[in-house]
A protein has these predicted regions:
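Extreme N-terminus nucleophile/cap motif
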Residues: 1-53, 67
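Short acidic (Asp/Glu) patches
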Residues: 46-57, 61, 69-76
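Short beta-strand or tight-loop elements
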Residues: 64
């Protein structure tokens, strides 16, 4: 079955550009992430991202945090 990818990123997680490259082979239709700084929930969305863009966003905003990451697979 076709499915999106949902990742629970922990403070110890370390996703790499190579991992994102693998993820977007089948799930490259969109990216979303959400995390809290204790005061506010932050979100980010990208359409048709490259692995390089995802790695940059991950390293700047998500790495070292509890976060939810969603990689979309178009199903229609």
């Amino acid at each position: 079955p076709q499915m999106c990818i949902l990742i629970h990123n922990t403070p110890k997680s370390n996703l790499t550009e190579a991992m994102f490259r693998d993820f977007i082979i089948r799930n490259g239709d969109g990216f979303g992430a959400a995390w809290s700084d204790g005061k506010k929930v932050h979100t980010i969305k990208l359409l048709d991202p490259t692995a390089k863009e995802l790695a940059y966003v991950y390293n700047q905003h998500i790495k070292g945090r509890d976060a939810i990451i969603h990689l979309r697979m178009r199903t229609h």
